[in-house]
Amino acid sequence: MVQQGFSIDLILARSKEEATDGKDSMSSRPHIPCAPQPLPPTKYAKEMPRKKDGQDVQEHTTSFQCSLGEQVINRPSANPSLAAMHRSSGSSDEFSPPGSEDDSTESSGRSSQENDTEQREKSPKSDLQRRLRTAFTPQQISKLEQAFNKQRYLGAPERKKLATSLQLSEIQVKTWFQNRRMKLKRQIQDKQHSLVPPPVCYPQTFPYYPGGFPVPLNSGSFYQPRALPFQAPQHSYIPQPLHHHVRMSSHQEQYPPLFGAQYM
């Protein structure tokens, strides 16, 4: 009995030991992921060197490549082929650090924004220059009108003298005279159109000539035939009755004789 109980206890103890050994083995096994995990971000990826000197930039890029290669080598990966690829790529010169594309896009975006701002800054100035119009005072307008009534075209010395007297520039006086001449031209054209009546279309008439066709009035020389006087017939037509001995056939027609009759 003692041996039997001892054997049962041994079996239970062995089963417990096996269970604990299985748990320890499960916990000690490394986790093998299905896909390679991404690398943690580094300070080189966040802030790329933006110095103008080419040597400093090359040093930063080489140190960044070496740090990435060491991280890949030291980190255990499930797929050994990926590790070998990372090792080979770390030593090659064609490795491009992440963030270079972002820097290029940022620089292009900044250049486009700067161009837009420059165009916007230039456009309001040009618009203001076009929209600016000199506001003449009534006294200046009256003096300009008097000078225009005397002389419509001013020479250089006269224009300069008038501009100094009115406290204006020569360009302002010149543009005012040009606009005033155009205004006068339009007024004259409007008056001419109002005085001239609109053209009326009348039907064209032709004279009647008894011996010929109607001839238009604009023809200079034309032939006029001589009109003949009316002549009465010499003998009057008197119808005579038919005799009884004359027989008419179905194929013959008999007409009365004509004595000196004329057809008109």
From Swiss-Prot:
GO terms for biological process: BMP signaling pathway; cell differentiation; determination of ventral identity; mesoderm formation; negative regulation of DNA-templated transcription; negative regulation of transcription by RNA polymerase II; regulation of transcription by RNA polymerase II. CDD domains: homeodomain. Transmembrane segments: none annotated. It comes from the Eukaryota. The keyword Transferase does not apply. It is found in: Nucleus. Residues 16-26, 44-59, 117-130 have a biased composition (Basic and acidic residues). Induction: By bmp4. Suppressed by gsc, acting in a negative cross-regulatory loop. Residues 129-188 bind DNA. PROSITE patterns: HOMEOBOX_1 (PS00027), HOMEOBOX_2 (PS50071). GO terms for cellular component: nucleus. Pfam families: Homeodomain. The N-terminal region is required for repressor function. This is Homeobox protein vent1. The gene is vent1.
